[in-house]
């Protein structure tokens, strides 16, 4: 099929959450570097101010009338249900206006899998549409199978006593029932309804996934067979086109602090943009970190401690504990931190972006997942890639100390570090010329130019 001239426009639709905005903006920059013009369609909930990385991009707002309080009041799952209903008509109007302005220049619509309202608008205007998955291929496969597994009573332990949740799920080794991507912010029924919409490829012509074959070859093969449309694993995108995409202000003073620390001596603690902790969990974590005798850099996001704006309601002993070995910031430049030679481990919620960024720098992990696909990622880090230690159950100082010392001091951690460096080399090889992700990206770009 003949390629059309470069410079055609791609419309990308982003989910208003940090973990989704970062990869879709990296994808946008990647496509822009390949010669495509870029339009980002976003809602008022994104709060994303274009940086110098995106001066050539067009940003348009999808009109909607949801109260701004819905983003926090409803929880992520119910909010996404409501947002998709609200934007279904308004995005058609928005896309119609873009077509009037751009004419035949628009090649396709690429939408985050959780913004599935975009598919109907693309279909109405006879535009090709592409699903973009910001989670792992394994998590995508789990979501696809969720309905069937639940109907066959295989996942019923999710509603049963915790002991039964340790049962392995047939054909999904090493995942247990409790590792399946369940949200703690919504009912099982509401979450399953969302998954039905996200995994329904409808009229999608292809799927892009921010992953690499060296990490998930079997899950990618399974997904390709299941979807029967092209699946393009083109990640990790942060290694292809790094971009400034943080919704929160990054405190770079922590880099100066890291510069004073010894190689591999610091455990970096950051639990993402959504997770919440109880005050007692914060105290237990601090005591465990202190008892481990390791230096630590800790991100405590404003609003992440229940009942507190930041850390002002924590006991006085907290500041005393921290002042000895630690450094606290409200938000950190994560990729820069993980690439710093002083960082020897990452205590993480195991969101997919954080997982890829940590592997991409050869940093082993302590895994404390909170919800959704984080549980899948944590299980794979520990049992498949063998570069992670999962902390399960309630947080207490003893568990924190043991996990940190296993990773940072003991021989077990050194083995993980060697495996992490090996995976880092494989990941970086995948995105350069001749690598699997590079080749997949070239195939996708060729496909886009034939539309």
UniProtKB/Swiss-Prot annotation:
Family of the protein in this entry: Belongs to the UDP-glycosyltransferase family.
InterPro entries named among the record's database cross-references: UDP_glucos_trans
CDD domains (alphabetical): GT1_Gtf-like
Lineage of producing organism: Eukaryota, Viridiplantae, Streptophyta, Embryophyta, Tracheophyta
Gene designation per UniProt: UGT76E11
Name of the protein: UDP-glycosyltransferase 76E11
One GO MF term: quercetin 3-O-glucosyltransferase activity
Key word Phosphoprotein present: no
Record organism: Arabidopsis thaliana (Mouse-ear cress)
Physiological role: Possesses low quercetin 3-O-glucosyltransferase and 7-O-glucosyltransferase activities in vitro.
